């Protein structure tokens, strides 16, 4: 891990992922006292606000920017964080964007698993090793279910939210590797250098998540 670069200790740089998590992340941060109005249909990747810079990144890049100190903190799915292998501080489970990573096969498939296709090779290899399954892991970029349907792989490892895609394609979950949701992650050096900004944000987000859980309202 590289220490956070020298900047104004009162200025935060946040790494936020494009896509499904971004809107919910911005809403939750606003509730925590950081109102961030990101322009729609803008090609800008860096947004400046009073006391805060927001970097819009691809999901898998958020842990990298935080770990290497370019961003002080970020929000990213636990699945992406695990796959990145980055040693960042993870103080709050934000409890939105919930899903789980599963081993999936065609319904009724019973033969040995010799090849597994996935976007999550680190997680897949760890799971297979823990089960003593000597399968080849093939990394794909999308439409993972198709690998099981075409015979490219005997099984796939992929995220599942509702399971509707699996049912529509005659696929079923064999096992759950882990559950995932959005997490707040923090650069460890920044936690010391910008403690006055980061600690209140962490505590406020934690309070909001706990309150919403108690009220059964979700956190948005």
Curated annotation (Swiss-Prot):
List the SUPFAM superfamilies.
Periplasmic binding protein-like II (SSF53850)
Keywords on record: Amino-acid biosynthesis, ATP-binding, Cytoplasm, Glycosyltransferase, Histidine biosynthesis, Nucleotide-binding, Transferase
Swiss-Prot/TrEMBL GO biological process terms: L-histidine biosynthetic process
Q: Which domain of life is it from?
A: Bacteria
Annotated metabolic or biological route of this protein: Amino-acid biosynthesis; L-histidine biosynthesis; L-histidine from 5-phospho-alpha-D-ribose 1-diphosphate: step 1/9
Record carries keyword Nucleotide-binding:
yes
**UniProt keyword Secreted present:** no
Q: Where in the cell is it found?
A: Cytoplasm
The record's catalysed reaction(s) read: 1-(5-phospho-beta-D-ribosyl)-ATP + diphosphate = 5-phospho-alpha-D-ribose 1-diphosphate + ATP
What's the subunit arrangement here? Heteromultimer composed of HisG and HisZ subunits.
- Role played: Catalyzes the condensation of ATP and 5-phosphoribose 1-diphosphate to form N'-(5'-phosphoribosyl)-ATP (PR-ATP). Has a crucial role in the pathway because the rate of histidine biosynthesis seems to be controlled primarily by regulation of HisG enzymatic activity.
The text of the family note is:
Belongs to the ATP phosphoribosyltransferase family. Short subfamily.
Q: What is this protein called?
A: ATP phosphoribosyltransferase
Please give the organism: Deinococcus geothermalis (strain DSM 11300 / CIP 105573 / AG-3a)
